[in-house]
A protein has these predicted regions:
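Cysteine-centered nucleophilic/redox motifs
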Residues: 154, 181-206, 221, 551, ...
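Surface-exposed loop and adjacent secondary-structure segments within mature catalytic domains
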Residues: 237-240
Length: 889
């Protein structure tokens, strides 16, 4: 440790730390100090910027210095440049404080502390001050509890603050989620991990990148308690650990993983190592697993060392990569996975091959790289997901009742906070006072949630007081709802006051969306325009405005690509890119667009292809910043039309639900990200423009049991401009629907209108009906209800009753008027379960060996026959119901 002072002294004195200096210092300690010291030294060499490491120029205690070294040795490049040493030192101070003051602090080993308590970052969220704030709020609440009970208590605290609500892919910071009072699963789990770490409890976010049995993904939390890792649903407290709504779903998972900060040497299988994190496989914590060994060979049967091997699961109508490994010197890789079907796709130097693998049956797999960019063809693939397994921990009725009471109280705490947001009338009065569009102002303030004061202050201070006043509402109007919930006053002021005026030849909507707009992609918004107005001369600004292609040339020549130190592809602030002149490819594109907009040039990242582009005289031009070009449209593109022969209840297949299109670039499929509402009729019926190259069309029909009838079609788009036709084929299930169980149609439920018991038969009449048992305020039920609403028209056309049973009349009254339960099909009838009799009957008659996971949905008839059953987390429920209904007729 003493000899490290040589290095820190050099940094503190501002001595240039070049490679020769590093070699001189490192040679002194390599034989006696740790990997951490070596990695820290290598990091200094890689960055070659004294300013970044200025935090080490001030005196620190040894434990603080070691923790700071650990963070700086492994943090991704954007975290190194975008946040100050003072910020990290405060986080280190509070981490050590929690370790000293919390009763379990001394029992946490160094490995678990360094990797699962100390790191600030959880996922790809914006970093904030939550470590200090959460510690001060939680310490008295948990310090007299056992470590096990403290984990449960912290989750109850999180539930007081946040409940589930889906949103876009950008991850809110923990404090932003608290301010908003809701978040998606990735944000809820980020919040819980941050809160647990704040009180010194090791925690990590666990992801299934994609489920195997339904179209979605999920994130939750594992907490280390007295030597063992336990899991829990974030902001969804249960009476005990290792119990969550996703127990059954996780038992059907193909892959669950987590990324551990730094060089981790724990007992779990390592999926990959980068300079910043170690990715580990935790699938065996949740599901039965088997090993698969894949050998990659060329056409002649010789091993292909270094080949990339991707393990892909069917989800959202594409084969999504769960894990990517590199073949060893014998051309082999090994991976532990859940026992279901998976696609193995291997490539090397432009050649590729693929094979479906049934994990648990196929232990040794051979993939031949026998395809090139000229290959075309198609095949049908039947996908079978893992079977449900596992048991829930036992919970007494008293524990359940006590937990339900706590949840109700926590809902009231959160709802009391939400009630402080301005109501519609106060929003309307505010808009009238400013003499602005009432409907637009009300929409903006509603969307901003707990950030409403920021928007009100911004509008009040600027409307009528600046020449840019006319652009205030357009500026707010182009922001996403999530942006409105966490945007700062500084950002709004910067982009209003420092964006160049709209040119006369530029339409207002182009100016608002692609010049004024602070949002480029998925980055955290910053007030960067004033910075670039200052650092770029008027002469340079005028030149680039006239020659935007030259700004693209400057970026290519002057901003180097670092493909090593940002493996998570976090977004670096544009100002930091300017200062360092080095970043990853994605951040360079954001930088190009951000500075272009600061210059008054309309620019964007194409939402379909990911290509950085600038606008000139009504045409979008590529900036040429992409290392791998997956552009789907360009000058001279081919108009590709797809014919489709409709199947029953599927007149217009949906992108991401029934089909996707990828461009195969250097042997690897790259998904084309068309809008979420794209369909066959809007995209392929009349044709989509595709640049020349090789493409992969995937279609799939999700079955009621989670299986998939999929088809892969690889085709070539020629170089010469012309039209071509392909076929969009949706496979159909063969045979009639089978009876899978029984449900007595005379079973009773509580009728809410008459306040008496009523039979299913008396409500549904003769024939088929849908019955659902729901659990309001849970993510699986919220998804199911949204799916029913999405299929409202077709379900109403069917005309049969849909009976939704709530756990109690109180639960019905508290939830039926909420937004998520609005606009349901007119055929829906709501009631109350009576003593769990219906669910117990279903479990018995369907021979289920574990407790039912809500929500439960069945299609049954008046002859007591059940032909469809689903439980727990299911995406696409409405589509599944309609698929079965179509077969019934």
């Amino acid at each position: 440790m003493k000899k490290l002072c040589i290095l820190w002294a050099l940094l503190g004195c501002g001595v240039a730390y070049d490679a020769a200096c590093a070699q001189g210092v490192s040679s002194v300690w390599y034989d006696q100090d740790t990997l951490l010291e070596r990695d820290f030294t290598q990091r200094i060499r890689a960055v070659s910027n004294n300013k970044v490491f200025s935090a080490f120029s001030v005196p620190m205690a040894d434990d603080v210095r070691k923790c700071m070294m650990f963070l700086y040795a492994y943090m991704p490049l954007p975290d190194l440049t975008d946040y100050s040493g003072v910020y990290y030192r405060e986080n280190v101070t509070y981490s050590l404080k929690a370790r000293r003051e919390m009763p379990w602090g001394k029992s946490v080993p160094d490995r678990e502390f360094m990797h699962f308590v100390l790191p600030v970052r959880v996922n790809n969220e914006n970093l904030d001050e939550s470590r200090r704030i959460f510690y001060n709020e939680l310490k008295n609440r948990v310090q007299h509890l056992s470590m096990y009970d403290a984990v449960l208590e912290v989750n109850h605290w999180c539930h007081e603050k946040v409940t589930y609500q889906p949103s876009d892919a950008r991850t809110s910071s923990p404090l932003a989620s608290v301010k908003t009072a809701y978040g998606r699963c990735g944000e809820e789990s980020t919040l819980l991990v941050a809160a647990l770490r704040a009180v010194g409890i090791p925690a990590r976010q666990v992801y299934t990148p994609r489920w195997a049995h339904t179209d979605d993904n999920h994130a939750w939390v594992e907490a280390w308690v007295d030597g063992k890792w336990y899991f829990l649903g974030a902001c969804e407290p249960e009476p005990v650990l290792n119990k969550a709504w996703f127990n059954s779903s996780a038992s059907r998972g193909m892959m669950m993983h987590t990324k551990v900060f730094g060089r981790y040497d724990g007992p779990e299988q390592v999926l990959g190592r980068t300079p910043c994190y170690t990715e580990i496989n935790v699938t065996s914590h949740y599901a039965p697993v088997s090993d698969v060994q894949v050998k990659v060979v060329n056409k002649k049967g010789a091993p292909v060392p270094g080949a990339r091997v991707q393990f892909k699961v069917y989800n959202y109508a594409e084969f999504y990569t769960l894990a990517s490994l590199q073949a060893d010197s014998t051309g082999q890789v090994r991976l532990s996975l859940g026992r279901g079907d998976i696609m193995v796709w291997a490539d090397h130097q432009g050649t590729f091959g693929f094979s479906k693998v049934s994990v648990g049956k196929d232990s040794d797999v051979r993939v031949v790289l026998d395809k090139t960019s000229d290959w075309s063809g198609g095949l049908d693939i039947d996908i079978v997901p893992p079977r449900q397994s596992g048991n829930l921990p036992k919970v007494s009725e008293e524990q359940e009742d006590a937990n339900k009471k706590r949840l109700a109280y926590e809902d009231s705490v959160r709802n009391a906070y939400v009630a402080t947001f301005p109501d519609h009338e106060s929003q309307r009065q505010f808009a009238l006072h400013l003499q602005q569009d009432t409907a637009l102002v009300c929409r903006l303030l509603t969307a901003s949630r707990g950030n409403y004061a920021t928007l009100q202050r911004f509008m009040s201070e600027n409307i009528g007081t600046t020449s840019a006043s006319r652009w205030i509402l357009p500026l707010l109007g182009v922001l996403t709802d999530k942006d409105l919930r966490d945007v700062s006053s500084d950002v709004l002021q910067d982009h209003l006051l420092h964006t160049p005026s709209c040119p006369k030849d530029m339409p207002d909507d182009i100016y608002a969306r692609y010049v004024l707009n602070p949002r480029v992609d998925n980055e955290m918004l910053t007030p960067y325009k004033a910075f670039f107005v200052q650092v770029l001369s008027k002469e340079k600004t005028a030149y680039y405005q006239s020659h935007p292609d030259e700004w693209a040339v400057w970026c290519r020549k002057n901003v180097a690509i670092d493909s090593v130190w940002n493996p998570q592809v976090l977004c670096m602030h544009p100002e930091s890119v300017w200062e360092l002149r080095k970043t990853d490819e994605h951040s360079r594109k954001i930088f190009f667009v951000s500075v272009a907009r600061s210059l008054g040039i309309a620019a964007r990242i194409d939402p379909v292809t990911g290509e950085a582009q600038y606008w000139k005289q009504g045409v979008w031009y590529g900036a040429g910043l992409e290392h791998v070009n997956a552009s789907s449209s360009s000058e001279g593109a081919t108009l590709v039309k797809a014919g489709y022969k409709s199947v029953k209840y599927l007149e217009d297949p949906k992108y991401y639900t029934h089909f996707t299109l990828s461009k195969i670039v250097n042997g690897v499929p790259v998904l084309l990200n068309y809008p979420e509402n794209a369909t066959w009729s809007s995209l392929l019926k009349d044709g989509v423009s595709l640049s020349s190259g090789q493409y992969l069309l995937v279609t799939g029909v999700r079955l009621a049991d989670g299986g998939v009838l999929s088809r892969m079609q690889i085709f070539k788009v020629p170089e010469k401009k012309q039209k071509m036709r392909i076929s969009l084929k949706m496979r159909e299930t063969q045979g009639k629907v089978e009876v899978i169980g029984n449900l007595n149609a005379e079973s009773l439920y509580g009728d809410l209108s008459s306040r008496s018991s009523k039979s299913i038969l008396s409500t549904a009449g003769r024939g088929f009906y849908v019955l659902g048992i729901v659990a309001p305020n849970t993510e699986p039920t919220n998804h199911a209800i949204r799916d029913l609403k999405a299929c409202r028209r077709d379900l109403e056309k069917w005309g049969r009753k849909i009976i939704l049973l709530f756990p109690s009349e109180q639960a019905y009254e508290q939830n039926i008027r909420k937004e998520e339960f609005s606009h349901l099909p007119s055929t829906v009838v709501c009631g109350v379960e009576l003593n769990h009799e219906i669910r117990e009957s279903l479990a018995k008659d369907l021979h289920l060996n574990s407790e039912l996971q809500l929500p439960v949905f069945v299609i049954a008839d008046s002859f007591n026959r059940v032909v469809y059953f689903s439980q727990g987390y299911t995406i696409g429920l409405g589509e599944q119901l309609l698929k079965v209904i179509g077969q019934l007729e």
